Amino acid sequence: MTTTIQQRSGANGWQQFCDWVTSTNNRLYVGWFGVLMIPTLLAATTCFIVAFIAAPPVDIDGIREPVAGSLMYGNNIISGAVVPSSNAIGLHFYPIWEAASLDEWLYNGGPFQLVVFHFLIGIYAYMGREWELSYRLGMRPWICVAYSAPVAAASAVFLVYPFGQGSFSDAMPLGISGTFNYMLVFQAEHNILMHPFHMLGVAGVFGGSLFSAMHGSLVTSSLVRETTETESQNYGYKFGQEEETYNIVAAHGYFGRLIFQYASFNNSRSLHFFLAAWPVVGIWFTALGVSTMAFNLNGFNFNQSILDGQGRVLNTWADVLNRAGLGMEVMHERNAHNFPLDLAAAESTPVALQAPAIG
């Protein structure tokens, strides 16, 4: 007599699903972080596309002056944006079910919160998925560490800055010109160009571009010849080959003579660590700078700091930036009741004309 033992299909199905999720043989690795990443990024992308095309104007300032951001309301690819949620909403969580109607939700900029929250969860999950795949393959975890730099930057402009300023209406709009507007207003209100963390970020981005171009051009110029003049040099490399495809000694000698010896790396591993670390650390500092300025710890103020012998101001670049910032601020605050205090013409009235005696 033959006895057949069959496992319960439910448990077997769940095990198959777990094996599929964590398998490194799939064309695209899913992972448990991917189970969270895929639906959130799909939701954010879908809502962004629909809102960018067809969303009605949003009362961003909370003063019944709606701002149109979608293509169907007269914008183009450059000027269009998903407008941030209304200042009347502030920092309140504003899902669809919190509004009295869909029209109210759209008028108050609900799609912005939907896109941003799903997007942030999605990129956090993507970073976790990078770590998860590295772990499965036995690799070091530095890929997700490098990715943490743009994640920190996105978190700073979409989450930390609105928290510090008290409203999601101060977050960065989701569009090209909206991004530029955010940058101009940020300079006007926080003097970011005079903040040392922003300077470190500029050095990180521009320096990273320079080092990447230098490295790529040096490697391309010192490739080991494997092809004829009539063939593409790319045919001289076979994926997985053990031989070096370029002569690092030649590249080191060239760059050492071009500048000086110790400006050139003689270790490929330390070189590539430097290429990764430089822009990552710079963008970390930028994100940290935006996060501190969110709570109004602003850039340095050197306005009218240099005087001549008669006490007259000698304008410096700091004064030029200050005048530009005042102009940008008055254009941004276009209503009388929001007129910037530092542009008020009248002298401020002291609360007490005489300090009370203590003791």
From Swiss-Prot:
Keyword Iron annotated: yes
Binding site for chlorophyll a PD1: H198
UniProt: [CaMn4O5] cluster binding residues: D170, E189, H332, E333, D342, A344
Positions that bind Fe cation: H215, H272
Keyword presence, Oxidoreductase: yes
Enzyme Commission number(s): 1.10.3.9
Cofactor annotation remark: The D1/D2 heterodimer binds P680, chlorophylls that are the primary electron donor of PSII, and subsequent electron acceptors. It shares a non-heme iron and each subunit binds pheophytin, quinone, additional chlorophylls, carotenoids and lipids. D1 provides most of the ligands for the Mn4-Ca-O5 cluster of the oxygen-evolving complex (OEC). There is also a Cl(-1) ion associated with D1 and D2, which is required for oxygen evolution. The PSII complex binds additional chlorophylls, carotenoids and specific lipids.
Subunit organization: PSII is composed of 1 copy each of membrane proteins PsbA, PsbB, PsbC, PsbD, PsbE, PsbF, PsbH, PsbI, PsbJ, PsbK, PsbL, PsbM, PsbT, PsbX, PsbY, PsbZ, Psb30/Ycf12, peripheral proteins PsbO, CyanoQ (PsbQ), PsbU, PsbV and a large number of cofactors. It forms dimeric complexes.
The protein's name: Photosystem II protein D1 1
Organism: Synechococcus sp. (strain CC9311)
